[in-house]
UniProtKB/Swiss-Prot annotation:
Forms a heterodimer with GatD. The gene is murT. The lineage of its organism: Bacteria, Bacillati, Bacillota, Bacilli, Bacillales. Pathway: Cell wall biogenesis; peptidoglycan biosynthesis. This is Lipid II isoglutaminyl synthase (glutamine-hydrolyzing) subunit MurT. Keywords: ATP-binding, Cell shape, Cell wall biogenesis/degradation, Ligase, Metal-binding, Nucleotide-binding, Peptidoglycan synthesis, Zinc.
Length: 437
């Protein structure tokens, strides 16, 4: 009776929330969990395969690629594709999408929510994308966060799908007896080298890791005297192109995709790894990968007549560097709109922008840079310190700042952080209404 009440109140809350113009992604779960504290556990027990997707960057793209591919092949799933990746949002997804025929759940999960959610749900497999410095006032340093995750997932019989090229992710191999690695061959692609480096010390002995090849940051082929090393990948990218959309060679199969950004190659590979481990073949995966387009502010493309735009979320140095690199790959003039908020969901500490490589903007052909958000002035200062010699315009209103990019002929590169994403994306949708996206 308690479960029935929780589910029905949650569904009513969803309808009410949407009726007043809100998304209703977290509220139903919050209400249900108050009525029945075991509601998520009970619903999860009805599903055969539960896949958790986590990591600092790329969770949403990886999750959506998996979800889209399964749906494209007529496989019914539970999927929190609206981005609510904490306990309440995950509960909402199970409540709204559970049916007797649904036997697979694809769940993006916030790194900080793993200990809480795993008290209620044990996934059959977890895939980790990467670990970079993100919101340190929320999660603490990377070493602490990774150790906490390893402790939480140990001895639960979870199959771990790990990025072999990231030593932080590879450390999680101590938490399971069943490990599948994915990675990228040396020289598969020449990533731009960043001035930002994460710790490259061995998690076993503390010595400096030796790198045979570096893709970017700490991502690459590494080894240590103590025996810790980059493991052989079962699923591997041998080469890929991006101009700006991805053309991947994974295990000798070609994938012509509609997502941009070289960093997304790892996200596509993570999704591929999950899908293969779920039993899908290459052709089935190709059906999904080659029809996937982003509509959630992750490398989302817009075009109306001669005006073009691209938006990509950036909430840490690695994400910002990736977004700035996309601008470098675009020919001709650009106009940037960059937003920095410091709301609770963003993390109050915005000092991470000083670790991002804004200096690379000086090499691009830029008409103007519009900075916006609650910390617009701090962005302005950071760009001045980077000696970016282009007009820098401060407009704290995100809607107005985004709309202003339409006054310029160049390609709009829009880079919001977490709570900036919704208003910036909304304005781009308005500005490009009737065009291509």
């Amino acid at each position: 009776m308690r479960q029935w009440t929780a589910i029905h109140l949650a569904k009513l809350a969803r309808k009410a929330s949407r009726a007043v113009g809100k998304r209703g992604t977290d509220l139903p779960g919050q209400i249900a969990r108050k009525v029945d504290t075991d509601v998520l556990r009970k619903l999860a027990e009805q599903v055969d395969d539960i896949v958790f997707i986590s990591g600092t960057n790329g969770k949403t793209t990886t999750s959506n690629l998996i979800g889209h591919t399964l749906k494209a092949n007529n496989i019914q799933i539970i999927h929190n594709n609206e981005g609510a990746n904490m306990a309440a949002g995950i509960t909402s997804a199970f409540i709204m999408q559970s049916t007797p025929k649904t036997k697979i759940a694809v769940i993006e999960i916030d790194e900080g929510s793993i200990p809480r959610v795993l008290k209620e749900v044990t996934p059959s497999m977890m895939v980790f994308t990467n670990f970079f410095r993100d919101q340190m006032d929320r999660f603490g340093e990377i070493d602490i966060m990774v150790n906490n995750i390893a402790e939480t997932i140990s001895n639960k019989g979870i199959k771990l799908l790990l990025n072999a090229d990231d030593p932080f992710v590879s450390r999680l191999k101590i938490a399971s007896d069943t490990i599948v690695y994915y990675g990228m061959k040396a020289h598969a692609h020449e990533f731009e080298q960043s001035t930002m480096n994460e710790s490259r010390y061995c998690p076993n002995c503390g010595r400096l890791l030796q790198y045979d090849y570096i893709h970017y940051n700490q991502i690459g082929h590494y080894h240590c005297q103590c025996g810790f090393k980059r493991e052989q990948a079962k699923y591997e990218i041998s080469s890929f192109d991006v101009a700006p959309f991805l053309y991947l060679n994974i295990n000798d199969e070609k994938y012509d995709m509609k997502i941009a950004g070289d960093f997304n190659a790892y996200n596509a590979l993570a999704a591929y790894t999950v899908l293969r481990e779920l039993g899908l073949n290459e052709q089935t995966i190709k059906n999904g990968f080659e029809t996937y387009t982003s509509d959630n502010g992750r490398m989302q493309y817009f075009k109306k007549e001669r005006k073009e735009a691209m938006i990509n979320l950036a909430k840490n140095p690695a994400g910002m560097n990736a977004s700035l690199s996309v601008g470098e790959q675009l020919e001709g003039e650009k106009v940037y709109v960059i937003s920095l908020n410091d709301n609770a969901a963003d993390g109050r500490d915005t000092s991470w922008i000083y670790d991002a490589d804004f200096e690379k903007l000086s090499k691009q052909q830029i008409e103007a840079i519009i900075v916006t958000g609650t910390r617009a002035e701090e962005l302005q200062l950071r760009l001045k310190l980077a000696e970016v010699e282009v007009p820098i315009i401060v407009e704290r209103d995100i809607y107005k700042a985004t709309a202003k990019t339409m006054d310029y002929k160049g390609f709009t590169v829009a880079i919001p952080n977490y709570t900036s994403l919704a208003p910036m994306l909304e304005q781009l949708n308005r500005s490009f209404e009737g065009g291509q996206s």
